[in-house]
């Protein structure tokens, strides 16, 4: 059987839905117009099928990479999208690429070292904003000797 562009689009849409959630994908599709429909099809096929379907990395690792890269590049809208959808992802579904607060913290600490403290700082602020919006505000933590390294 020949793999068609439509097959790739179906797989890409499935990956997008697993990682970003049905609601976000439906909103994105609803915004398609004569200017951007080919772009939408291209990213769905190339990025969401061609890249996100590759066997070399699991989806959680890919999402972590997206967070680090988007923070390093200052692509805060995409960063926030992956923070939010990662926190909302089903923790029992590894294909949904769920994230926890500790992982987000580690990504941003690493990003601050390699991409600069301002990127880490902005990423922390956005992550905290999303956590608060989701009702998952982190508890206060000690800043002194009891703070973890």
Task: Map each language-model feature to its residues.
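Acidic, glycine/proline-rich low-complexity segments that act as flexible tails and inter-domain linkers
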Residues: 1-60, 83, 88, 95, ...
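Amphipathic alpha-helical interaction elements
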Residues: 17, 53, 70-71, 96, ...
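Short alpha-helical scaffolding segments that buttress acidic/His motifs in well-ordered protein cores
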Residues: 43-47, 64-69, 107-112
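Helical "substrate-binding/catalytic lid" subdomain
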Residues: 57, 61-64, 76
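Mid-chain, well-packed structural core segment of small domains
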Residues: 67, 72-105
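Substrate/cofactor-recognition hotspot
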Residues: 117-121
């Amino acid at each position: 059987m020949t793999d068609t562009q439509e097959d790739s689009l179906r797989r890409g849409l499935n990956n997008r839905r697993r990682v970003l959630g049905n609601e976000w994908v439906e909103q994105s599709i609803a915004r398609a117009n004569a200017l951007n429909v080919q772009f939408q099809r291209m990213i769905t096929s190339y990025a969401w099928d061609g890249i996100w379907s590759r066997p070399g990395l699991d989806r959680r690792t890919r999402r972590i990479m997206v967070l680090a890269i988007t923070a390093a590049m200052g692509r805060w809208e995409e960063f926030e999208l992956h923070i939010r959808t990662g926190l909302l992802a089903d923790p029992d579904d590894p294909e949904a690429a769920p994230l926890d607060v500790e992982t987000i913290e580690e990504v941003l600490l690493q990003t601050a070292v390699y991409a600069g403290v301002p990127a880490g700082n902005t990423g922390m602020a956005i992550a905290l904003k999303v956590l608060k919006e989701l009702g998952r505000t982190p508890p206060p933590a000690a800043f002194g000797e009891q703070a973890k390294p």
